[in-house]
Amino acid sequence: LVLPSIDGYVGADALSVYTWVKAMEGRKKILAVDIGTNGEIALWHRGQLSCCSTAAGPAFEGAGLSMGMAGKTGAVEHVRVQDGVLQAHVIGGGAPKGICGSGVIDALACLLELEQLDETGLLEQDPAPVAPPVCLTQKDVRMVQLAKSAICAGLRTLLRVEGLCGADAAELAVAGGFGSYLDVNSAGLIG
């Protein structure tokens, strides 16, 4: 089964998210986000589906980062702090080759926790080691900040058009592979 695109910037993957949102229509308000190069956002409210697309850039997919890669063998997919030290989980085990989107979000949250990254996104050490040889640079942090800002702008705009604020949304669903591996606590910590 191949789903059609909704429009030039809202593709078939987003259509599957919107189909899920439609299936949940008994619920009051649901926001769904499909994060990729385009951040596609859907809002189900008052029996109507509204959507928008933002230019999130590829940072959440690991692309465009100094050591970014897709979520495949060798990618750091999760990072935790244990006894004051970063501990990374690498897909497939073995030595890390790069870092994927979920790993970047975790790594930034951990660097914040360890006070090696401040609230403005400034790294104490550039590059910051995550799982040697994998590290994050100041430019990587800025790319993630730009992607986050694009998603946030899309969410706020869509809510404002519908006369809502963030607190009005009953649920937020993050779709796709990225959504499946994203640690909600890490995402919340980095904003």
Task: Give short role names for the model-derived ranges.
Residues 1-5, 16-19, 25-98, 102, ...:
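Glycine-rich phosphate-binding loop of actin/hexokinase-like ATP-binding domains
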Residues 23-26, 47, 81-84, 109-117, ...:
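Generic secondary-structure signature for well-ordered alpha-helical cores
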Residues 6-10, 96-100, 135-150:
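Catalytic cores of large soluble enzymes that bind and process phosphate-bearing ligands
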Residues 35-37, 124-130, 168-178:
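A glycine-rich phosphate-binding loop feature that marks nucleotide/adenosyl-phosphate handling sites
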Residues 14-17, 145-167:
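Phosphate/ATP-binding catalytic cores across multiple sugar-kinase/actin-like superfamilies
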